[in-house]
């Protein structure tokens, strides 16, 4: 029993280990593609964000360069186009011959970091009032013209292209038979026809007149002909008369033994036996199957 319990315990442990291994392998097979897809999605999103940041920085840097290139002296006054305009004058600078003149411009410095985007500007002023329309809003309908008289017909135009072919018309009624023509020339003789069927048997001929038969003279002896083919085998001959009996043959081998005969009648009953000895009861039984008796014997 203890050995069987150990086998069951080891079997349970082995099955559990195999089951956990299969579950772990399936989990890895399912998790790895999901992690790969997530990492690929994050990488693609980061690349899009970096490209967007680069484009924004490039746009900001372009606007900064445009602001630097604007001339500060040419400033347009505000409220231009209203009641009063303010003309901005350029700053007057006095000349000085004895002053030190600035040197040549140095090399361009490294571009600075892009600044933060500015705050949205204040809303603009209302626009100027629009001009009145040059044309009326409702279209003016001119009076209808009087109908002119019909002019003379023009010259005929060139013939048009030929139309498509029409469908087949209905079949006409059969015409009258023509007059028979003149007989034609004799044609060449045709090929020989197939042989005709055999004719009916003719009438039997008349019997020849009876005349005495006169034998003719014998002709010369001819050369001997070739040997003819062998003839058909002849009919088998009749059976002959039976012969005289032959001498006595040797003795044959002994035959197989015959089958057993029928069982005999039962014999008479024997004399009754004597009285048997007294039985001996076993004293105890051993574990290995032996039996011990009171007289010390073992069976």
From Swiss-Prot:
Keywords (A to Z) from UniProt: Collagen, Cuticle, Disulfide bond, Repeat, Signal
Domain of life: Eukaryota
Disordered: region residues: 107-278
Amino acid composition bias (Gly residues), ranges on this chain: 163-172
CC terms in the record's Gene Ontology section: collagen trimer
GO molecular function, one term: structural constituent of cuticle
Signal peptide: 1-27
InterPro entries in the cross-refs: Col_cuticle_N, Collagen
Keyword Disulfide bond: yes
Biased composition (Pro residues): 129-161, 215-233
Family classification: Belongs to the cuticular collagen family.
Self-association and partners: Collagen polypeptide chains are complexed within the cuticle by disulfide bonds and other types of covalent cross-links.
Record protein name field: Putative cuticle collagen 155
Organism: Caenorhabditis elegans
Gene this protein is translated from: col-155
């Amino acid at each position: 029993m203890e050995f069987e319990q150990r086998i069951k315990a080891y079997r349970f442990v082995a099955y559990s280990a195999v089951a956990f291994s299969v579950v772990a392998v399936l989990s890895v097979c399912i998790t790895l593609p999901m992690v790969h897809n997530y990492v690929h999605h994050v990488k693609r999103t980061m690349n899009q964000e970096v490209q967007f940041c680069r484009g924004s920085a490039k746009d900001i840097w372009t606007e900064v360069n445009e602001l630097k290139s604007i001339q500060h002296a040419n400033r347009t006054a505000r409220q231009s186009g209203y009641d009063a305009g303010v003309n901005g004058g350029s700053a007057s600078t006095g000349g000085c011959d004895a002053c030190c003149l600035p040197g040549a411009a140095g090399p361009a410095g490294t571009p600075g970091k892009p600044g933060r985007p500015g705050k949205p500007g204040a809303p603009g002023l209302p626009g100027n009032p629009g001009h009145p329309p040059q044309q009326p809003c409702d279209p003016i309908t001119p009076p209808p013209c009087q109908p002119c008289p019909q002019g003379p017909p023009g010259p005929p135009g060139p013939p048009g292209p030929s139309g498509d072919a029409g469908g087949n018309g209905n079949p006409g009624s059969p015409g009258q038979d023509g007059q028979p023509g003149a007989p034609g020339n004799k044609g060449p003789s045709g090929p020989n026809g197939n042989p005709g069927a055999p004719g009916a048997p003719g009438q039997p001929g008349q019997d020849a007149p009876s005349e005495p038969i006169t034998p003719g003279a014998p002709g010369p002896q001819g050369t001997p002909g070739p040997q003819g083919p062998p003839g058909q085998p002849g009919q088998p001959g009749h059976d002959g008369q039976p012969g005289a009996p032959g001498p006595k043959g040797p003795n044959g081998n002994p035959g197989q033994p015959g089958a057993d005969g029928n069982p005999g009648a039962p014999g008479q009953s024997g004399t009754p036996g004597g009285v048997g000895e007294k039985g001996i009861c076993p004293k105890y039984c051993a574990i290995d199957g032996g039996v011990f008796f009171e007289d010390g014997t073992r069976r």
